[in-house]
Amino acid sequence: MSPTMFTIISILLSLICLVVGYFVRKTIAEAKISGARNMAEQIVEDAKRDAEALKKEALLEAKDEIHSFRVEAEQEVRERRNELQRQENRLLQKEENLDRKDESLDKRESLLEKRDHSLNERQQHIEEMESKVDDMIRLQKAELERISSLTRDEAKQIILDQVENELSHDIAVMTKESENRAKEEADKKAKNILSLALQRCAADHVAETTVSVVNLPNDEMKGRIIGREGRNIRTLETLTGIDLIIDDTPEAVILSGFDPIRRETARIALDKLVQDGRIHPARIEEMVEKSRREVDDYIREMGEQTTFEVGVHGLHPDLIKILGRLKFRTSYGQNVLKHSIEVAHLAGLMASELGEDAKLAKRAGLLHDIGKAIDHEVEGSHVEIGVELATKYKEHPVVINSIASHHGDQEPTSIIAVLVAAADALSAARPGARSETLENYIRRLEKLEDISESYEGVEKSFAIQAGREVRIMVKPDSINDLEAHRLARDIRKRIEDELDYPGHIKVTVIRETRAVEYAK
């Protein structure tokens, strides 16, 4: 290639490069200008948004300040209003105090006037009495002049007779008032002692029944208990003296008998036989004998546990065992051992309040029904049997007298005997302590109402509170107030003579007179 051509080509390439560079530079410049323009617009937009945000923030701050100012203003107004209300209340209070003081001054002035009037009347009365005394002195002088011819002893006797006649009525009135005050104080103190004792003593009672239930693993066991031709059940009934009732009750056998110790022996023996699975006459005899020993041990443990619980020590071992037998005795559904424990606690608490020997009172209370443990085995009442047992085991004379007198068979010779009788009545008569059969209960209620309605003038009677109170409505035109009291006493006496009941029965006679008119 010639140099000239090379030069031309170089020039052309340079020109092309210049043109291309120009256009490239122009394009870059335009792009930068466009980017700068966009950036400027973005900055403007951002500035506008920031300005708008600042504006809103300023408005919110202004609103918050306005709200805060308003709240503070309302609070201040409220406080001022409350302060004004308090000032008004204080003024009203002062005004009321002034009114009360004014009223008090008026009352005081009225009282002073009454006292002045009373003093004037008293002064007048004193003057009248002085006049009467002067008259009496003159009369006495005249009487002395009349009897001056008598001896000294005769004159003294005449004066004493006159004084006795004048003061006999006053002495009788004062004696009656003193007796009433003494009775009121004694009643108040007795109620206080009883309430304190009852509050500090709490005992639970379990109502016993005449049946026990033995659960079986399955009904097939019933056939094994009966045995071939009934020999097993006959053996068990013969050895324990308890009837076995096998009926449709699922998986259960009922033991029926009135001797709780025998029934418990049969229950334990039957439980052992069911668990062992071997049921035949020889095994039954073995289990019954073992159950008797267990029941005897349990009775002894119950006696020892009871003496420990009550805090009575030094009892004869045989007496402790007899005491444990009370666990299986009931009276009107009340467990006798629980009843004896409650009586012991009540008697001890009341003895402490009266300053008597609390331990001796507990001992007497615990043993007061000891005769019930064997009264079905020995002839005589439980009181007589209890006295014999206490005497046999050399108990304290106070304990023996407490047993003998707690039902009124003998006179109590000590305060402790009286406390035991009171504790026995409290434990037996409190609501829920004793129960009776439904038939006897209904019969007793009907008898109460029949006795009450048998008197002339009785309109209707109601036995309420489970038979512990009877209310008698009488005709007011047939019976007056005095006759109502006499009627209550007569009904009370008939109830005591004709009915047997635990605790006491309150007799209330209600006489009501109504006068009705209609305004038209």
Curated annotation (Swiss-Prot):
The chain crosses the membrane at residues 4-24. GO terms for biological process: mRNA catabolic process. Residues 336-429 form the HD domain. InterPro entries: HD/PDEase_dom, HD_domain, HDIG_dom, KH_dom, KH_dom_type_1, KH_dom_type_1_sf, Ribonuclease_Y, RNase_Y_N. It comes from the Bacteria. It is an enzyme of class 3 (hydrolase). Belongs to the RNase Y family. This is Ribonuclease Y. It comes from Bacillus pumilus (strain SAFR-032).
